[in-house]
Amino acid sequence: LKTYRGVPLVKILAGIRRCGKSTILDMLQDDLVKSGIPADHIISMRYTSEDFDDGMTDKDMYNGIKNLMADDGRYYLLLDEVQEIDGWEKAVNSLLENANTDIYVTGSNSKLMSSEISTYLTGRYISIPVYTLSFSEYLEFKKSDSRSPKELLNEYLRLGGFPLVAFGNFD
């Protein structure tokens, strides 16, 4: 993501559920703060939260975010599970055009990649696929595990490369 920081495109992190997209946004937020971005210029929204109404519209989304922007400075928008908002593409496009923003969104593959993206965001986004852990990444998570690489490979093949699985012990 660092490669695309400040690039005037919507960065869309897409992948299957539980593959680590939200964690990547959390890590990005930490990196932004460490690099000197004021915390009040980082707007993080998780649209699966109970804080949002089921019937939230693109206008509600747009106005809610705009109301958090207190000045003309650059704002970093970290929008998690945006596909939960009908018409999110319009809101994000308007924020890209009408505000000083660097926008990152996540969502699940099936709902996120609709035809509306091509309508509202053509040429204005980059899709960044997020996958489950590779075996070498899985080994990195398990480096304190005393089992042999072969045993860990069997576990990886049996349970998959989801980060939550890599943190657990499923013997």
Q: What would you call each of these model-derived segments?
A:
Residues 1-171:
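Phosphate-binding site recognition
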